[in-house]
Amino acid sequence: MHPMLNIAVRAARKDRSPSRLGKDVLAICALADCVFLGLHGADGEDGKIQAALDLLGVPYTGSDYLGSAMAMDKAVAKRIMDSNGIRTPAWRELRYTEADIPRLCEELPVPCAIKVVNGGSSIGVQLPDTREELSSALRDVLRYGDRVVVEEKIYGREMTVPVLGASALCPIEIVPPEGSSFDYVAKYQSGSAAAAEICPAPIGEEETKLLQETALKFHRALGLAV
């Protein structure tokens, strides 16, 4: 949980609990015939809720706890991509402290992408282009966690492919505002700061087929619900 969100949740609860789950929520879920999961972020996407429902013997929609946990962990997901021949930017996993930053600034390539392994919504993501930017990026990312993935920075169009059941749906092209990346603001704000999402993506049949096949292959490798 983000530190500021933790503080806000505690302040809103009489018992000062940091839990984002309401009182007796698991007891309520235990009464359900099936739980429809529409959760986003930590606890909802990382398999924790799914594991709790499994312990209660309550069926739910979507992927199970293991697939969710592996997909949420970028380092685990990258290893699965590598072992299944799915192309992904060159990468390495790091666990570091403030004291390691000077050494890492000498070792790591720039430009690069730095991502907290279990983050989402582009929180804890930095895209340094110079050694000076790399130093400040490594310090900033430490606010969200000390375990990160450092990737080769690649350039091109960004696509996402939804998977429903056993079918890959139409690829969607994501077009951030000019001069920006697909960051938190571009994902969730409206107006000129928002990214455009074009569906179906303006690409050919061959590219569409390749994207859909890759999405299904990755889903199956992770054990996600397909």
Label the predicted regions.
Residues 129-213, 218:
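Phosphate-binding site of ATP-dependent enzymes
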Residues 41, 220-221:
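Serine-dependent amide/ester hydrolase catalytic core
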Residues 222-226:
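Short, intrinsically disordered, charge-balanced linker/junction segments flanking boundaries
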Residues 41, 122, 177:
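Glycine-rich phosphate/pyrophosphate-binding beta-alpha loops
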Residues 1-66, 70-72, 76, 83, ...:
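ATP-binding N-terminal substructure of ATP-dependent carboxylate-amine bond-forming enzymes
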Residues 22-29, 68-157, 209-212:
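Active-site nucleotide/adenylate-binding loops and adjacent lid/helix of ATP-dependent enzymes
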